[in-house]
C-alpha cells in the first residue's frame, strides 16, 4: 500500500486505537506493525479470529493477560548460559503464572454449547491449547525465591546453614554492642546510644575528643567532624566472621541462580512458543475489544472490486456520524459523488478507503451485517493536501502530482479515491481534465470513487456506461445537508433555491438563471427531475414495504392457523385410534392391579374383593360404551357437568369411580380419591355420577374401619434417601387417610435438614393434609413433624 494514502486515510490513528487495547508489550509491537494485506484467505482468517475472540469476550469476559512479561532478552541470555538476576527469574515466574491462568480461563470456554458455537470458539481456543504450562519450573522458582524477590532459606541446605550462623554471630555482636553503649564507662565517650553500619561493619558514634581513648577502629566521620564512627575492638573478630559468612551467602545465592538459569535454559523453546502464542492471543482480543467499541462487524469479502457498504460510520469522527450506504464495483466501476460543501462527500470517500484498509489489516468495521468489502492490491487516495478530514485544503499541482503517480500504478485490482477532481484551476478546463482522468481509469478497469462540483462530470456520469452518480442530500427547508448519501442521483448546486429562501430578490435570481449556459440548465433540470422521481420512488417504496409487511403478517397468521388445524386433525384421528386400542387394555391392567393389592391387604375381606371385582366388570362395560360414544362425537369431546369437591365421579379412561378431593379450575385439573388410590386428572376426563346417599361411601368406609386398627400414627423415615422417603410418605398418607386418623407424627431427624425438606414438600402438596408443624420440645423438636389430616 502507498504510504501517503495510508496517512491521508488516517490508518495510523486506527492502529493507535487498537494498540490501546493490547495488554502485553509484544502484542502492542505486533499491532503497531499491522499493514493491509491483499491475500483474500489471510484476510478471511484474520476477520474470523476477531469474530471468535469477540464472541468469547462477550460471553466469558477478558482473558487474564496480567503477569505476562517480555522475556525475549531473558531467553536470549539463558540460551547463552548467562546467569540471570533475581528480577529476571521473577519475570519468568510471572509469565509462567500468567500462562497457567490463561489455560485455566480457556478451560471454561465452550462447555455445554452447540456445535456451531464450538466451531466459532475453536478458532481461538486452538491457540489456547498450544500454550504449555511449565508447572515444574514454576514450582522450582517458587521454592527458591519469595514474592518479594528474596532468596528463601529453603533454596539450599548450605544457604540455610550459612544464614543460621550469620544470625548467631549477629546476635553476639548485638549483645556486645548493647553492653558497650549501656556501660557507664563509655557513655561519656559516645555521641548517642545507637548502633549503625559503615562499610558493612557494625560501629558506634564516638565523640571526636575521645577517638584516641575509645578502643576501636575508625570507619567514618560525620560532616561536622564532631563524631567518629568506630568499630569496637571487642567485635572486630565477630565482624570479620560475619563478613566471611556474607560472602559465602552471596556465593551460594549465585550458585542457586545459576542452577535456576540452567533450568530456564532447558525450557527456552517452550517459553518462546508460549510468548509468541500469548502475544497473538493478545492481538486477537485487542482487535476484538476495538470491534466492540466501534460496534463493528465482520463484513463479507471478495477480490472482484465489489464494495457494498450498508450503514457505514467513519470510526474516527468525534460526533456520531450519519450512516452511509454506498455501492461500487459491480454494475459500475466508477462512482461520482456530488453535493454541497461540508455535506459529507469527503467523509464518505474516506470512509470507503479506511474500511478497505481496516478489513485488509484484519479489523472489523462499523457497519451493518450486509456490508461487503473488496480486497485491493493498492489503495490510492487524493484527498485534500494530506489533511485531516476536518479540513479541505488542496492545490491543483499537488492533485496532479498524486494523480500522475496513481496512473502509473493503478490497475483492475486497485481502488482510487479522488476528492474534488479537477479543482484548483479554470472550472471548464478542470472539468474536462477530470472527465478525461475518470475515463482513463474506467477503461483500465480501476474501481474509482470521485467527488466533484462540476456539471460536466455529472453529465459524464449520467451518460457513460459503467459510471454512476451519487449525491449527499440537502434539506431545502433547513438549508442544511443531511449527510445521507443517495445512490443514482447527482447533486444539484441548489444556489438559486438557497438564495431565494434567504431573501435574494426574484429579478436577480431570474437574471442569474438566464446567464447560465444551455447545458448547465439542462443538467440542473435533469437533476431536479431525478430528485422528484426519487422522492416519488421513496414514498412508493415505503407504501409497498408497508403493504408487503401487512401481507406477510396475514400469510404468517393463515399459515399458523392451517398448521394448527392440520395438527388438530391428526391429533384427533390418532387419539381416537389410540383410545379405541388402549383404553380397555389399560383399564383391565389397572383393575387387576387393584385386585392384587386388595388381596395382599390383610384387612380386605372376601366380600370386599368380590364387591370391587363386580364394580370393575361393570365399569369395563361402561368404558366400552363410552368408547362407542366417543367415535360418534366429531371432536372427541363430551360436555361435563360442573365438578366440585365432594362430588362422586367416574374416570372416563378407566371407568373407576371416586370422590373429588380438590379442584384447580385454572389448570383444569381435579384430584380424585378412587378407592385406595388418588388420581390427578383433567376435568374433561371425569364424569359426574349420582349415587344414593346411603350407599355413597360404603366401600370406602369398609376399608376405613378395617384399616384404622392396622395403621400406626407414627412414621419413622430416618436413614431413608430423599426420593424413597417421599414415596413412603405419600403411600403412608393415603393409608392413614383411609384409616380415618386425624393427626400423625413423622420422624425425619435433624441432620442436614434435607429429609425434613423432603417431608414438608410432600405435605405441602398432599390433598389430605390441612396443616403441619415441627414438633414441640417434648415431641422431639425439629426432628419431628406433626401433620393434621382432613376429616
From Swiss-Prot:
Smr domain: residues covered: 715-790
GO terms of molecular function: ATP binding; ATP hydrolysis activity; ATP-dependent DNA damage sensor activity; endonuclease activity; mismatched DNA binding; ribosomal large subunit binding; rRNA binding
Source organism, top-level taxon: Bacteria
GO biological process, one term: rescue of stalled ribosome
InterPro entries: DNA_mismatch_repair_MutS_C, DNA_mismatch_repair_MutS_core, DNA_mismatch_repair_MutS_sf, MSSS, MutS, MutS2, P-loop_NTPase, Smr_dom
Enzyme class: hydrolase
Record SMART domains: MUTSac (SM00534), MUTSd (SM00533), SMR (SM00463)
Enzyme nomenclature, EC number: 3.1.-.-, 3.6.4.-
Key words, A-Z: ATP-binding, DNA-binding, Endonuclease, Hydrolase, Nuclease, Nucleotide-binding, RNA-binding, rRNA-binding
Residues reported to bind ATP: 339-346
One Pfam family, short name: MutS_V
Role of this protein: Endonuclease that is involved in the suppression of homologous recombination and thus may have a key role in the control of bacterial genetic diversity.
PANTHER family per record: OS10G0509000 PROTEIN (PTHR48466:SF2), OS10G0509000 PROTEIN-RELATED (PTHR48466)
Family, as annotated: Belongs to the DNA mismatch repair MutS family. MutS2 subfamily.
Quaternary structure and interacting proteins, as annotated: Homodimer. Binds to stalled ribosomes, contacting rRNA.
Protein's name in the database: Endonuclease MutS2
Encoding gene (name): mutS2
